[in-house]
Amino acid sequence: MVSWETSIGSRWVPLLAGALLFTSCGGSAPPPPPPPPPSEPTDEESDAAQPPTTQDQEAAPVPFVFGVDLDTVQAGVFDQGKMWTFEFPPTDYIERTHGFRPDEAWFERARLGALRIPSCSASFVSPNGLVLTNHHCARDFVTQVSGEGESLLDDGFRATDLADERPVEDFEADQLVEIIDFTEEVNAAVDAVSAGERSEVRESLLEEIEAGVLEQRGGEDSGYEVEMISLYNGGRTSAYVFRRYTNVKLVMAPELQIGFFGGDPDNFTFPRYNLDFSLFRVYDDNGDPLSTENYFPFDSDGLQEGDPIFIVGNPGSTHRLQTVAELEFRRDVSDRYMLETFRRRMRVLQAFIRANPEAAEEHHLRNEYFSLSNSEEAYDGQIRGLQDPIIIARRQDTERDFQAAIEANPELRDRYGDLIERMAVVQEQKRAAAPVIGAFSVFGNPYLDSSTLIRGFFALQVIAMRQNQAPPGDIEDMMENVIETPQMHPDLDAALMADRFTEMSDYLGADHAAVAALLRGRTPLEVAERIVQGTMLSDSAIAVTALQNGSATPQDAAVQAVIAFLPAFLELNALYVEVGPLEEELAAELGRARFEIYGTDVPPDATFSLRIADGVVTGYEYNGTVAPIFTTFYGFYDRHYSHEGKEDWALPDRWLDPPSTLDLRTPMNFISTADIIGGNSGSPVLDRDLEVVGVVFDGNAESLPGDYIYLPEKNRSVTVDVRAILEALDEIYDLDRLVLELTTGELAATEAEADARR
């Protein structure tokens, strides 16, 4: 999946969270040298859990790989991708590559028909506010609207009439209506101060600009949102103005087994057989379906091999402009440790879900496990790419060319000549802190850490702030963190806490002062269970009350645990306080240098802002054979029966006995060379006439290194074909009103009305 998962590595303890994940099942969100840690528990699990040292991970230089002299490896033309911006539309490139020249109106239609929704992308697909996205982007909302006795995630949801569509909360659909360039103003302000002040000045100015632009459009209640978007690591800065829609209802979502057919085994693979789609509807302020001219009609005729396609969506994050030293640090330290944390937490979650199915359903833990599993697969694939000497050699070639271009210009050399070297020094500083980085990987994430431990962390700060007579507003802000920490089942709370304590012991060593003070000769699980049972902070409501009335003290068991490991935590925090601003400034200067040298010929890294990626419908070689371009319902049923209906390939009853009119020849999924990443999930796949031919939901395994390099030879995006969507709506779900709307644009309030019109 390729949605952009922000729940892991979010604002919680931001200096240490360090990750924005991809849930696609592909694209999706990003680590070990060979051999990688096992993804499932094995007899060697205890060995795999030991923290690898930097020395273990660094391989000696290899001049030849499979007969290839690495010194002769050259970068590809599109190694840095094809995620083109709407600020600098690739008009000439499209004309050269695809044989037509889109005008300004074409790009405007593409921009206004697209939407950004939570962690994903979407689009208007009818003049009546109908919105198409992925099923995996809708899971949380499907769970949200399930009534008592319903299990809509498993059973699916279909609104047969307009009145049956169900309102969803916290769904924001953002339509990009304007882009305003502020690069000169921002760069002038940054250049006017010393290097140590630039980060703070930049942040302050961006906040000021954002507030001013929003005020010009009517303020916070205007229905507009403004976001400052920095491209090229700050080399370009613009205000993106969005029309935000929040009155949204769920219209249709297939069963989980259909939207995620094949489960984890088929994730990030092709051939694929998924109906990973869902439909929402935007309503206006009067409660009527939104009337809009900005939508993409369905192209029910579909595509053929060699056809060009365009994916318009919001890729979440890439690091294709990072230096080789930064990538090597990720490979050897940060991303590797994060991957191991994901694998450990997956085992904890899986064990709890199996032992407590009802509690797991109540806390929506299956959705969390799906996201975590997806992220684990993404990070594993990206790390494997970073271990590929040829990929690193291509990145080194790109970096050499960049440095040479800087050196060739005296003015650029004076300003930017030492940036790459200085960035390498910063990475070495961080390497020195590898043990504490591992011990606190994604620390504070509410889905990967104990809620009690997180509350203890914030509670300690509340207590200290009160003792130091901090301003009431600051204390209230810290209390918000306690309030927003979600409630967790006590058994899962203790298991996650024990897993964190085990990591601290593994990475820091059992003799480390923090570990010794924390465990005192006991096992991590013994300590965790005593804390959960003995603290006032294991229940969110009680925790808030205790902090408000002062009954929660430094002697609380959870607070004492935080005090025990705090010195090690602060060691890492101090490092990031020291090098973080410098690293950010170096990245911004490198971005400016790249833009001055290459201009818009090299697309910027993804920023969860709107992009357009072109591609061609074509296959690729894999596993000694050739992948088909299209899969069909024939293959879908073959997959089910070949696996004897096992869990990941099981089918709901309505699919086990389909009507004889279901056309099994219908194309179901297809692949293209379009460049995507986490956040693109739900993006419309368009033909040259801006008609929808599919909705992208994943990438193949070969696309996983796409975080840092685009390899068009085998990188493929995976898309649900609209012909399969229409066939399923018509023949399986009997939703004639949606088929009518998607094929003609006509809105029917009921199935009976739609039947009469058809």
Task: Label each region the model flagged.
Residues V2-W4, S10, A19-R758:
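Terminal presequence/propeptide segments associated with secretion/organelle targeting
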Residues V13-L15:
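Small-residue packing motifs within transmembrane alpha-helices
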